[in-house]
Amino acid sequence: MAAAVSLWPRTEPLLLGALPVPPPARLGPHYLRKMAAYARARAAEGCYPRLSWPRWRHIACGKLQLGRGLAWLYFERFHDLLPPPDPPRRLQRAEAEAACGSAEELERERGKLSVDTLRFLLFLYLQQLNKASLRTSLIGEEWPSHRARAAGLPGRAAGQSKNWNDQDHLAFLLTHLSDMLELLLEPEQLGASSHATHNSLVSYEAVCALSFLIEGTVNNSRTIHPLHELALWQPCHGQNGYSKISKTFSFPKLENWLRSCLIINPFGMTACLRSGKKLAWAQQVEGTTRRAKIACNTRVVPEVSPMVIMSQVYKQTLAKSSDTLVGAHVRIHRCNESFIYLLSPLCSVTIEKCRNSTFVLGPVEASVHVHSCDNIKVITVCHCLSLSSTTGCTFHILTPTQPLILAGNQAISFAPFHTHYPMLEDHMAQVGLATVPNYWDSPMMVCKEGSDASVFRLLSPLDFYTFVIPFEMEGDTTETPGGLPHAYQKALNQREQKVQIWQKMVKEACLTKDQRKQFQMLVESKFYEWLIQTGNRQQLDSLVPPAVGSKQAAG
């Protein structure tokens, strides 16, 4: 009886590894095959089986014509995917980089890093996930199309995000499986055309590398295994062509076996939408037909990060610090005119098609990606921030990597992280994020479009105010981690001095009781006008009483 093996694409490499932007032309399959041959031929120089940063920098800048910043971006992004993040080691590395006093010292520190060559090749190939398809853009779809209806939670119809769509993940693997397998072959296993032949053999090391992308299970059990463990399982040898003598796999048999076993990820977004737990975190706002939808996949196996998908939160304040969010991949979609606080350590966050809202996020271990949003504010400590197709958005961030400005952005404002909540520093330690280095003010223009000035600016200290999180929680953090840059702290101090002078002037004015009452009414009236003009009135109205609010934040 045939072994009932099920395989599927792993979520993290495709969700977090593939940049949500078309890759440079020189990261195409042809050039990656050349890179694979080059790396194997220079094994003694630090190219294989592990590729050092100096050797990758040479290949990327000298052979592939990539900029140094982009070369480091790919290298670091992959380095942080494997092995699974180790918070103490990540903090140690951040401390070492922050201690570097010059660019030369920083390069020497980075020169200590290396990555698995074969897996890195697969990671570079993954960048094709978001490659623009000329055929698709020319053909388009018949209108009205079934996809256009975004009923329910955001699936393929609503989001069009390949990084978040496990159906696209499976389609990508099936379409490109042969190319990726060839990329892992030893040179002598390739034919004259640089492609595999019927007699080509795939090494065990190559299948181990492919475990970066594929995992699975046997007989639908809840135990997940990496691909190489399942490939070595005795009942599968007849199907995948494994030879115990040569410790290799037959290329055509292995490819056919993989294709026959690959399915959509049973723990991915599709499963979350179809059978995930619905969360009653949001309120139904009177006078609107929009109904907020929030769902999570139940944590059915320890190897799988939870997912939380949030859609159509409208005109309200939502605050949560919950075990459901810890280590979760969060997708926030079509949330408008709201204030959303997710005060837990998160794995990744994607914010799409949101308008006129504020998002306060707990520390994010991997990445925050913001796409197609207008007039939103994001406040977070995160490892990486990337932006595409945003307009008029402000980002108060603390991040050890350069914010990535992709395509289609306008009027972005960057500002220092300016808030705290009691558990913030504990949560930062859990995900391995420190206060240094901090590149909030040094974004990288990955997609060059016009002048930098038309795309982003640094918020003026004159327009800077601290942000207060209005919920009670237990914890030790009492101030913004790392403090504020000097210019911003100085602006706050000057503003505070003006308030003190004004208070002293009022105190010394010797007003009568009636005058004090009249003056108080005037101040309250002006304050009320300011609340309405700034939109803060809506936030205050949507806040629940403190006792219930504390439960909401903690529950």
UniProtKB/Swiss-Prot annotation:
Gene3D superfamilies for this protein: 2.160.20.70
Cellular component GO terms held in the UniProt record: cytoplasm; spindle pole centrosome
Compartments reported by the entry: Cytoplasm, Cytoskeleton, Microtubule organizing center, Centrosome; Cytoplasm, Cytoskeleton, Spindle pole
Pfam families, per the entry: TBCC
Keyword entries, A-Z: Cytoplasm, Cytoskeleton
PROSITE patterns attached to this UniProt entry: C_CAP_COFACTOR_C
Keyword Zinc-finger listed: no
Domain C-CAP/cofactor C-like span(s) in chain numbering: 302-433
BP terms from Gene Ontology: maintenance of centrosome location; maintenance of Golgi location
Superkingdom of the organism of origin: Eukaryota
The protein's role, per its UniProt record: May play a role in the regulation of centrosome and Golgi apparatus positioning.
UniProt similarity note: Belongs to the TBCC family.
Name the record gives this protein: TBCC domain-containing protein 1
Species of the source: Gallus gallus
Encoding gene per record: TBCCD1
